[in-house]
Amino acid sequence: MRRAILLILTLTVGTSLAAGFSQKDTPINTRYRETPEEAAAREFKEHTAELPPLPDAHSDGWFDIYVDENYGKQPKILLDSLQIMPAPDGSIRYILNIRSDKGYDNLTAEGIFCARSSIGFGNGKLSSYKVFGYGDTVNSRWIQPRNAEWKPIGGTLGRNDALRAVLYQAFCEGGVPADTQGLVQRLKERAGRYAPSMKPHDK
């Protein structure tokens, strides 16, 4: 009988302690619930914007992008074309000219999205890029691809697309700058031939 009473008391005390240990005592806040507004702000929604007039490939305002000594093309980005799309898009739009080794201009209107994390949570979008138009320099117009899609920027990007890997490092690493002036500064610091953070690349 005495043992039964002790057992009942032990169970009663244990239950009381368990009840007193609330979720707020855990290292993870299990009570937090994301609001619809927060979820909407986190989810990506592409902003529809008209393409700008096709620029002159030989005008001022183009910035030379350095990839590496073995990259045979001459990529340039039009600084005046840089813009950050409003939320919930947040991607960076720009115009590239990937000039061939024979001097042919290849203009593209593109966007790059910088994810906050390398891991997608829920509907969170991963880092990716998209081509919105190809430049027709003969007829001075953009040709929009029929099935343009955002292409994920994965671990193989550096090997398969060295140019956009440089743009990703310039725009995305360390967070997206607050304005276009910050984007221009990033390009000069990280993507130029004589970027301050890099040694001169001339042989």
Swiss-Prot record:
The keyword Signal applies. Pfam families: CNP1. It is found in: Periplasm; Cytoplasm. Residues 1-18 form the signal peptide. One of its GO terms (molecular function) is peptidase activity. GO terms for biological process: proteolysis. Keywords: Cytoplasm, Periplasm, Signal. It comes from the Bacteria. Its main location: periplasm. Belongs to the Cnp family. Was suggested to be clpB, but this protein is not that chaperone. This is Cryptic neisserial protein 1. The gene is cnp1.
